[in-house]
């Protein structure tokens, strides 16, 4: 029987550890503060922002939220980011994506100080990851590493296949697996023999953005499957990139959707906020 990797439980454990750490920091006069900026009122973005606020409140991290109107200009947003960069009370700055179409997302990400880039999206953070320097790691890939480690799954020497090459998941995921001594293959829409490559994987990370794309023909017996996808099926139920019911009996471990990778993203964001406060206080 395969191990169902419980992201809810593991993320809860991490939040408890952070709660204790924040309490000890407060006793030393060190506070942790996350500022979230949302432009417009996209309902999904509002849910994500609310979840971040709740996690902050639980752990003891102060959260500030700027809810800016849709018509906010690029210059106005950059001016706010510049002000927050200079505010020593603020440890982490996060602009909820996507931003409205009239804005330049790349310029916005680059405007955030790398010292406060708790999303891990700044080019300096990405460069630090590839060279092994200290920096903030994108939250979803960092969460996946924690899922594997805390489930007793070794990455060292394993054949790891990442399907998807996005800047948020695929690319940083491949770098993190490499850092853990995995032998990494990254696949994408131009990969010719996708099924054959996936069948070789000891650890398969599915981040292709297509519901139930991966069935049992893509995985070998005893593989570990990490499902990053999140979709709604025709019955309006959540599902991932992996057809869970077809794959579960063939693999040694798998993340469900929901309750797998998703909860880890916010837990690792909170971890990055605490890390930012420690660095700002030379700890």
Would you name each region that the model predicts?
Residues 94-155:
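Anion-binding alpha/beta catalytic cores of soluble intermediary-metabolism enzymes, centered on
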Residues 1-30:
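Positively charged, low-complexity intrinsically disordered leader regions
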Residues 76-88:
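Short, well-structured alpha-helical segments in soluble
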Residues 98, 208-210, 229-230:
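Short glycine-/small-residue-rich Rossmann-like dinucleotide-binding loops
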Residues 101-102, 212-214, 233-234:
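Short glycine-rich, flexible loops that bind phosphorylated cofactors or substrates
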Residues 41-53, 135-224, 237-248:
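Glycine-rich phosphate/diphosphate-binding loop of Rossmann-like nucleotide-binding domains
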Residues 56-70, 184-186:
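Short beta-strand elements in bilobed, periplasmic/extracellular small-molecule ligand-binding domains
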Residues 105-126, 226-280:
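Rossmann-fold NAD(P)-binding glycine/threonine-rich loop
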């Amino acid at each position: 029987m395969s191990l169902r990797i419980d992201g809810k439980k593991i993320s809860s454990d991490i939040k408890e550890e952070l709660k204790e750490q924040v309490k000890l920091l407060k006793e030393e006069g060190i506070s942790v503060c996350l500022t979230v900026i949302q432009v417009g009122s996209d309902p999904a973005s509002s849910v994500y922002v609310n979840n971040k606020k709740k996690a902050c409140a639980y752990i003891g991290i102060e959260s500030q939220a700027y809810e800016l109107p849709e018509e906010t200009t690029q210059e106005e947003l950059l001016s706010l980011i510049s002000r927050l960069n200079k505010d020593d009370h603020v440890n982490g700055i996060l602009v909820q994506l996507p931003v409205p179409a009239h804005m330049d997302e790349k310029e916005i990400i680059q405007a955030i100080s790398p010292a406060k880039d708790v999303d891990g999206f700044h080019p300096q953070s990405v460069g630090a990851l590839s060279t092994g320097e200290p920096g903030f790691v994108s939250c979803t890939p960092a969460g996946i590493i924690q899922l594997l480690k805390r489930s007793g799954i070794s990455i060292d020497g394993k054949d790891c296949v990442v399907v998807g090459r996005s800047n948020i998941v695929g690319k940083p995921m491949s770098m993190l697996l490499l850092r853990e001594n995995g032998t990494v293959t990254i696949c994408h829409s131009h990969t010719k023999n996708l099924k054959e490559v996936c069948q070789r994987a000891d650890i398969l990370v599915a981040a292709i953005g297509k519901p139930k794309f991966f069935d049992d023909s893509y995985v070998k017996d005893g593989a570990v499957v990490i499902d990053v996808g999140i979709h709604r099926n025709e019955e309006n139920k959540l599902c991932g990139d992996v057809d869970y019911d077809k794959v579960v009996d063939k693999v040694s471990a798998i993340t469900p959707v929901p309750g797998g990778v998703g909860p880890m993203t916010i837990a690792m964001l909170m971890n990055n906020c605490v890390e930012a406060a420690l660095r700002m206080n030379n700890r």
